[in-house]
């Protein structure tokens, strides 16, 4: 049993637990805000994920930067990976809206660079996405323009860009992935299947190593 008295302000508590530990209990007396619990080993790579389902990725710059800097430094962050753009491809989007969205993504990159100026940023672009055009599934209108706008913004802001769309095979590749046996994409022609997501992960890994 370990007892800590927490002072006002930001605090980090670290426990070094035996490798055979499989459960624990945290009890709190009084009022306290807990922003996160990280379970890590002394070796290997630790990934901290922010799974914002349906998000466009333009909200980071509204988060208190000093608080984020404190978190990232305590986590010893060595790489920031952003993957956004697909949820911004709503029906009826215009080129002007794509331009505005890309500029907003640029602000997010600058936000992270200001917090961790020495940490590289990798932006993963949208995959191919299909829509029904006169009874035929085709790459969504303006998707290529979205990808190009994001690529230019990311690179111009000093971050790395990985083109998922091109890695898949380019235009109408989502249809091909969905029609594979076993399928690498879902029947909605937007999302990957588990097997397809694994394959994309492998392709990204291979790109980084090469």
Where are the language model's segments positioned?
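Structural signal for conserved beta-strand scaffold positions within catalytic alpha/beta enzyme cores
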Residues: 49-51, 123, 163
């Amino acid at each position: 049993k370990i007892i800590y008295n927490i002072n006002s302000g930001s605090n980090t508590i670290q426990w070094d637990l035996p490798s055979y530990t499989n459960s624990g209990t945290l009890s709190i007396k009084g009022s306290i805000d807990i922003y996160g619990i990280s379970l890590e080993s002394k070796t290997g790579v630790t990934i901290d994920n922010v799974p914002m389902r349906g998000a466009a990725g333009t909200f980071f710059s509204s988060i208190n930067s000093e608080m984020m800097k404190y978190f990232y430094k305590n986590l010893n962050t060595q790489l920031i990976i952003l993957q956004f753009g697909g949820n911004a491809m709503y029906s009826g989007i215009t080129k002007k809206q794509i331009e505005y969205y890309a500029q907003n993504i640029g602000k997010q990159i600058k936000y992270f660079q200001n917090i961790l100026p020495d940490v590289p940023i990798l932006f993963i672009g949208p995959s191919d996405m299909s829509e029904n055009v006169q009874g035929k599934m085709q790459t969504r209108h303006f998707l290529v323009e979205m990808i190009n706008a994001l690529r230019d913004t990311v690179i111009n802001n000093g971050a790395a860009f990985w083109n998922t769309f091109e890695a898949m095979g380019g235009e109408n590749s989502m249809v091909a992935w969905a029609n594979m046996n076993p399928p690498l994409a879902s029947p909605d022609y937007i999302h990957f299947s588990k097997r397809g997501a694994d394959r994309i992960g492998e392709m990204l890994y291979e790109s980084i190593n090469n």
